[in-house]
Amino acid sequence: MKKLQIPTVDDINILNQMCSNTGVASQPYINNEHHIMHDKYIEYLNNNGNPWLCMGKVISTNLTDKLKYHYKKPFHLLNYINELRSKGSPDVCPFCGSSKTATLDHYLPQADYPEWIIFSKNLVPACDCNSKRRNDVKGNNNNQRVFHPYYDDCLTLRLVSASFRGNMDEPEIDFLPISNQTIPDETIMFHIDTVLKRSTAINWMSSKWQSMRRKPRCVISTIPRGNIVLTMQDLESYLLQCQEDKDDEHKTPNNWYSMFITGIINSTQAKQWLLDRQNGITQGTISPLD
């Protein structure tokens, strides 16, 4: 989950060139439906790609098929597609916050919104989480929608925390929205349910928890080396430092590491367990393998 710079591609100029270039496979269809495509591009720009305000599936099947072809095999006017694919967002997935991006995908799914198949502002670097949300981009009311990495400035704020409950040796992991005045909790929760929970985030955090259980410093890297017994104040300081480091490393507070650490910071039970674990291992009263 990360705010990205909006691509500077002049999509409307490219559309006009495609309309007049007889060497382009889609030219006859774009020429026939140019006014529709032009209006749809303007609609997207005026509404920041909001799925509640952008109406899809109004172009012909023939044009849709040609646009899909161009997306898979871009010609010279569409080189920006290859550039977006190659540059990506190498430090974090803009949709879910994982430390990976493997592809370029559509914010508004091409199955339901074919008008924007090659539209640069609808093409976002992503990991496999975007395909796992399938065609779900909005819910039952206009507060329920997936965040748009190009347009949702709230992504620069901390929006999501992990939560840990039950037996802290192997806790139940979930996600909670962090309220702020810029976006409804319902929007954050929809993104959590539609994107985060369908990703591998919970499995990743479960694995990280077990690594932390064996050696807390492996995950909370700001804990000093050596046989130092920590106070709760020490631990809280190290957690905040680590959270800040991960925010800076990934250039967003909504990466998986920061969500994980934020969940510990916000849980008295998790912090006490971690403090007891760290000090017990340091003093030899707890085996890292127990």
Each language-model region and where it sits:
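N-terminal accessory alpha/beta regions
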Residues: 2-81
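Short cysteine-rich loop/turn motifs with clustered Cys
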Residues: 82-103, 127
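Short, intrinsically disordered, charge-biased short linear motifs at domain edges
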Residues: 77-84, 111-116
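C-terminal, charged low-complexity interaction regions
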Residues: 2-18, 191-290
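Glycine- and acidic-residue-rich phosphate-binding/metal-coordinating active-site segment common to enzymes
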Residues: 101-185
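Generic hydrophobic, helix-prone segments enriched in Leu/Val/Ile
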Residues: 22, 28-41, 71, 160, ...
